[in-house]
């Protein structure tokens, strides 16, 4: 099968983990990695894998986009620079998959709304790692009955959180809470991130609380949650229900654990895994459309 060529912008934890995912794809071919530190481990690993690299930021990539037939770019830098990065690649006709909390384009949480995205869009936002882990659960409840309030708490190991993510904590909470409402279906959303310095590092843990407008239909919500867990596990095998749904009046609580594949950072970094796997899955759907195939033709 012909592959769609891609560029990775950002050579940190997320960009490097995503590189390994893309190398396994049957539809996507990573050809460039962009960084700003010539000595970064991410760029060194990319070179070892035969990927072209530049340490001159986005401007080091732009002159090569047409010659190298790049159709999709992934931004794993920071919300502060994403707008400029996106504008520059969009001007060259490249689709931008945004892994920062910038949220310029529409949100995408694959098992909830991937199939509803318009093929003509030029920027799609992957929310945040906490959003990718928890919004499917909010949606699993809200598709059964209206959710008045949704609150998510994402706990991640300190070692898995690089400087880019740390700079974007405020954007993380704003973007995630917005997507809990827009994609999860809660009338009001709230998001909290906890960075845990424990050693040895803990797996990503997520807690989701939903307040339903009426008495929860326990059987229907439980079935919906289990169905959604299975959908997420298709691309994140380490996504597991630890407890719940637990019902207390109108409050529905769900407790998750996310173990990574260990592509770049060890398995405790499930927060990287769910973000990069979601981005790869989203890009593969757009790539199939570019190749003129229906997404149902390939279950990647």
UniProtKB/Swiss-Prot annotation:
The active site is at residue 129. SUPFAM superfamilies: Glyceraldehyde-3-phosphate dehydrogenase-like, C-terminal domain, NAD(P)-binding Rossmann-fold domains. Disulfide bonds: none annotated. Its EC number is 1.2.1.10. GO terms for biological process: catabolic process. One of its GO terms (molecular function) is acetaldehyde dehydrogenase (acetylating) activity. The keyword Glycoprotein does not apply. Belongs to the acetaldehyde dehydrogenase family. This is Acetaldehyde dehydrogenase. It comes from Pseudoalteromonas translucida (strain TAC 125). The gene is mhpF.
